[in-house]
Regions:
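Feature captures C-terminal
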Residues: 21, 25-192
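Intrinsically disordered, low-complexity terminal and linker regions
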Residues: 1-9, 23
Length: 192
């Protein structure tokens, strides 16, 4: 078991500090990619929680043990279909705690009280009447971290495996393709 946990499965170009935009963006972006592949749905965005990522990712070698430490919980990936109204409400919950993890294409600004001022997906405002497909984990879909708006969504897909296993496989596939872990340093939830 020790040798398995020390087994190098990938490399990170730079350090992704704990609870940083670099780390949460990487996790949200790969969640979006992985769930699209697993579910076959055209998913619009991914919502994850900073608290579910338990440690930083250092630059250099990434071991199976590190990934297991980063994602120790028994959470499963899900696809939800929800109204823009409920999505905006969920973004308000995220803003009230200083922002959280969103995938590429999402840009949210909020005020000091935690109220969303602007929420855009690929440059277009979130429409309260439109339906959106959202990738997330069962913990959030069940209302964890006060994400009650997600409990009103229709559940389209629920994976059977712990999502950390999918992250491990994603990193292994990246390595097999001769690529390293990279992230985008952008603040997708900004307090104005």
């Amino acid at each position: 078991v020790d040798s398995l946990m020390n087994h190098v499965v990938g490399r990170s170009v730079v350090e992704l500090p704990h609870k940083s935009d670099l780390l949460t963006n990487w996790v949200s972006d790969i969640t979006l990619d992985i769930i699209k592949d697993l579910s076959g749905y055209k998913v619009d965005l991914a919502i994850m929680n900073k608290g579910g990522i338990r440690c930083a990712m250092p630059a250099g070698d990434i071991t199976e043990g590190l990934l297991d430490s980063m994602f120790p919980f028994d959470n499963r990936y899900m696809v939800l279909e929800m109204s823009g109204k409920d999505l905006l409400e969920a973004l308000n919950v995220m803003a009230s705690r200083g922002g959280d993890a969103l995938s590429r294409g999402m840009m949210v600004t909020y005020d000091k009280s935690g109220k969303v001022l602007s929420a855009k997906l690929k440059g277009k405002k979130i429409d309260p009447k439109k339906m959106y497909k959202v990738a997330t984990i069962d913990y959030l879909a069940n209302g964890g971290d006060y994400m009650v708006p997600l409990t009103r969504a229709k559940r389209l897909y629920e994976d059977e495996q712990k999502y950390g296993i999918h992250v491990l496989n994603y990193v292994k596939e990246l390595t097999a393709a001769g690529k390293q872990i990279k992230s985008v340093n952008e603040q997708r939830m900004q307090c104005k």
